[in-house]
């Protein structure tokens, strides 16, 4: 891969008792590119995400974000240095409006933390509306998140993550729980935003259509170790990857190639 490296993961290792969750994992993420990590359940994907995001400290190795060594730093400090994140189960304040959710995120960026139950009124509303417009949710700005379809909540969560002006965005199974059409739309949206804003995106995903349709580079993780890495076509054809995805997974790989 070539370009501006935003994230450098260097020989990360993590074990839980006798179970190796990450074994000398090394990769980079660059500006404007989407990097997917795939693998069977228990492969270590969440462990790597949590070490990058600060929820777990590695046993050894190093994580560098935009020139800053963030290894073992707490999540909020890493967020301040330019890391945004969305989750497998979307995390929003359901009782607040769509706009208020994004306004709260913007107020945190500016150091103006507020209790979630206090009205946001006009604070950073214009900035919030701009972000909501970009993710296609401006018309729903004054609706409570509790009234939204789940696919729309995922879009709001993306706007919340963007409110922190991230250099790098971690997306943990971004299409989980969504209909096929919604999955394609969300991934196309994330890819477009990443390229226009020069944000690096690292995501995990079980939907192979989402992976091979949108990732610039694919990493395949098995038992904590990267067994294959490269462009979609090369990874899909790798015999080691096809062995891992025998059965339903292999069918998914073939279907994604169509």
Language-model-derived ranges and their functions:
Residues 2-258:
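Glycine-rich phosphate-binding loops of nucleotide-dependent enzymes
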